[in-house]
């Protein structure tokens, strides 16, 4: 699943919605092709392992005619109901100013939900855990995708078996080491390569279906129902492997803001769904005629002369699918920073044209270590499949829950109809989640453990910042009180323009009080800058800056930024000066407070979490670097705070 945003894409998206002429159709086609490389890479490479795991994996079932038709029926209806009906028809209606994804949906609930108190806290916690699951998915998906593609080498020649793991680790290492360069130059190739991939897998499927057309009767739902009823618990556990066919469906919703609903829907129904079904049914036809091919039915469709080109194409497709997920983790990390769930981290823009193309070193190296470690630990894509899926099923279930509250509280949908719909989708989600959880002790715990760690980190940072702000607020006074005190006892004023960054626009920054207490002077022009992180993707320039003249040489500037934007001090100064601030950038001194966190007995936070918060605070990117302040004009004042 990936979450990303590009300013130019938003403009194109808008024009596609309004322009139905030749130019509009051309733009729609271009956007649909681009969506192929970003949105559909994950779900598009699932044929490499989904059918195989149903019949050959650790939880596989015998490849009899009834079982093959039953599994194909479940695959068909999973794609139709989960992707086509649930996501493309309903979930994609829930957007936060055009943006999709778990965090965007959670922010929408915080802003508009009528729930208060414990219920609202629980919804936010569920949404935050859903976002945390992406980090676990971000380690598993590249590992299983690239590994399953390169495993085709051992089909070409069994002697290549020993090379599979080292080659996979080498490809993954190269992928992560390349991230700092961005994808601007090679990104244009993603769409055409994935297009070629879908055409190739569709042709491979058609060739086998023509030989065994009886396989098409698997579209009848009775075959799937009969399979589940006839195989009892074994059939239920196979659902976990069936679900591998829809991993990546969440990306359709998460990347909605990147490409828009229409291009994603058109691409899915006209190309992706037909290609996937043709390949899955082709693999089924192969198993009906040759059950012995269950060890790798995908490569069983490939003629011997095309095996090497197909392995190369599959590897390229899985690298692109992994790239989309890595980019999604970068974007999610940036959103979490902006929404106050993670400390400030280095975020590098890799493209001057596209604001959505970013690189987050901390996230990149964490994913690299985790992904390569997972490949080394599990050793095969079949073993990895047991760990795959549980994070995605949990995310889908969480999306269903959050969607219910949006439809109920924000859209005021008919309660009876909404309850029926949500019960139907929740039953599907719970079935797949239960089947995936049956593999808990065979690797499914890995992404859950990663998600739990990330949830703890994000929740600890959010709670720690609240406690820190409360402690600082108790040690200062309000801006109004401070301005009134100046009229009673005016300190010595010295010429100069200074900016104090403040986390709370209503109270005096600690740095200002310490400067006044120790230096006994106050500058003639003082601006209090507050960066407000809004729960919307973007804030237009017309509403971004609020300038408030407080009197006695004081001005308060509130800069509002969305969770997909990056704070920019130069932009803030320019917009504020347009409203009469008249601060000269080269002559400003920036005063910051740097808090030293000390674990104490003043708050109820667990000692271990206090230590974790203090550790994150010490290693967070400095405000000077994060806001790109001119280092030669910055004065930092230290303050020790006990929590």
UniProtKB/Swiss-Prot annotation:
Its main location: membrane. HAMAP family: Kup. The chain crosses the membrane at residues 28-48, 65-85, 121-141, 158-178, 187-207, 224-244, 268-288, 301-321, 358-378, 384-404, 415-435, 440-460. It holds the Pfam family K_trans_C. It is found in: Cell inner membrane. Keywords: Cell inner membrane, Cell membrane, Ion transport, Membrane, Potassium, Potassium transport, Symport, Transmembrane, Transmembrane helix, Transport. GO terms for cellular component: plasma membrane. Residues 1-20 are annotated as: Disordered. Belongs to the HAK/KUP transporter (TC 2.A.72) family. It catalyses: K(+)(in) + H(+)(in) = K(+)(out) + H(+)(out). InterPro entries: K+_transporter, K_trans_C, K_trans_N, Kup. This is Probable potassium transport system protein Kup. Transport of potassium into the cell. Likely operates as a K(+):H(+) symporter. Residues 1-12 have a biased composition (Basic and acidic residues). It comes from Chlorobium luteolum (strain DSM 273 / BCRC 81028 / 2530). GO terms for molecular function: potassium ion transmembrane transporter activity; symporter activity. It is a multi-pass membrane protein.
């Amino acid at each position: 699943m990936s979450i990303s945003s590009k300013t130019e894409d938003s403009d194109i998206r808008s024009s596609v919605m309004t322009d139905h002429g030749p130019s509009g159709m051309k733009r729609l086609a271009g956007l649909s092709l681009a969506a192929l490389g970003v949105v559909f890479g994950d779900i598009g490479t699932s044929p490499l392992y989904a059918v195989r795991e149903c019949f050959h994996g650790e939880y596989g079932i015998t490849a009899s005619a009834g079982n093959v038709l039953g599994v194909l029926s479940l695959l068909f209806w999973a794609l139709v109901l989960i992707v086509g009906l649930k996501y493309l028809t309903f979930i994609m209606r829930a957007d936060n100013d055009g943006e999709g994804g778990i965090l965007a949906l959670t922010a929408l609930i915080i802003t508009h939900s009528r729930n208060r108190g414990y219920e609202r806290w629980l919804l936010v916690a569920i949404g935050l855990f859903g976002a945390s699951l992406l980090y676990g998915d971000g380690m598993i998906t590249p590992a299983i995708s690239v590994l399953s593609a390169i495993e085709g080498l051992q089909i070409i020649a069994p002697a290549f078996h020993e090379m599979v793991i080292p080659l996979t680790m080498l490809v993954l290492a190269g992928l992560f080491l390349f991230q700092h360069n961005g994808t601007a130059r090679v990104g244009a190739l993603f769409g055409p390569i994935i297009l070629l991939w879908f055409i190739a897998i569709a042709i491979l499927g058609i060739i086998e279906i023509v030989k065994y057309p009886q396989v098409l009767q698997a579209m009848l739902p009775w075959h799937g129902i009969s399979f589940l009823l006839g195989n009892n618990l074994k059939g239920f556990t196979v659902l976990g492997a069936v679900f591998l066919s829809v991993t990546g469906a969440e990306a359709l919703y998460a990347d909605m803001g990147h490409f828009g609903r229409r291009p994603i829907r058109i691409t899915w129904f006209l190309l992706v769904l037909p290609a996937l079904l043709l390949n899955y049914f082709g693999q089924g036809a192969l198993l009906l005629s040759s059950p012995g091919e269950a060890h790798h039915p995908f490569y069983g469709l490939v003629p011997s002369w095309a095996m090497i080109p197909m392995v190369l194409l599959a590897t390229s497709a899985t690298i692109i699918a992994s790239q989309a997920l890595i980019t999604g983790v970068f974007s999610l990390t940036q959103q979490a920073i902006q929404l106050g769930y993670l400390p400030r981290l280095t975020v590098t823009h890799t493209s001057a044209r596209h604001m959505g193309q970013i690189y987050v070193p901390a996230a990149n190296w964490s994913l690299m270590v985790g992904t390569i470690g997972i490949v080394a630990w599990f050793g095969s894509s079949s073993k990895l499949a047991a760990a795959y899926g549980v994070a995605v099923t949990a995310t889908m279930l969480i999306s269903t829950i959050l969607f219910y509250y949006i439809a109920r509280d924000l859209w005021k949908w008919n309660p009876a109809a909404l309850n029926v719909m949500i019960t139907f989708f929740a039953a599907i989600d719970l079935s797949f989640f239960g089947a995936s959880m049956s593999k808990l002790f065979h690797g499914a715990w890995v992404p859950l453990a990663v998600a739990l760690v990330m949830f703890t980190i994000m929740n600890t940072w959010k709670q720690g910042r609240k406690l820190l702000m409360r402690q600082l607020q108790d040690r200062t006074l309000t801006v109004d009180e401070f301005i009134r005190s100046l009229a009673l006892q005016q300190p010595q004023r010295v010429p100069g323009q200074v900016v104090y960054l403040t986390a709370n626009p209503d109270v005096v920054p600690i740095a200002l009080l310490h400067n006044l207490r120790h230096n006994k002077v106050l500058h003639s022009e003082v601006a209090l800058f507050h960066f407000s992180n809004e729960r919307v993707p973007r804030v237009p320039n017309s509403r971004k800056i609020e300038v408030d003249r407080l009197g006695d040489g004081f001005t308060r500037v509130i800069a509002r930024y969305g969770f997909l934007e990056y704070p920019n001090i130069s932009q803030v100064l320019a917009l504020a000066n347009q409203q009469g601030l008249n601060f000269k950038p080269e002559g400003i001194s920036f005063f910051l407070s740097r808090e030293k966190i000390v674990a104490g007995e003043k708050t109820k936070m667990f000692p271990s979490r206090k230590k974790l918060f203090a550790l994150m605070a010490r290693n967070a990117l400095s405000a000077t670097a994060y806001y790109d302040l001119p280092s030669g004009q910055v004065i930092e004042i230290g303050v020790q705070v006990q929590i």
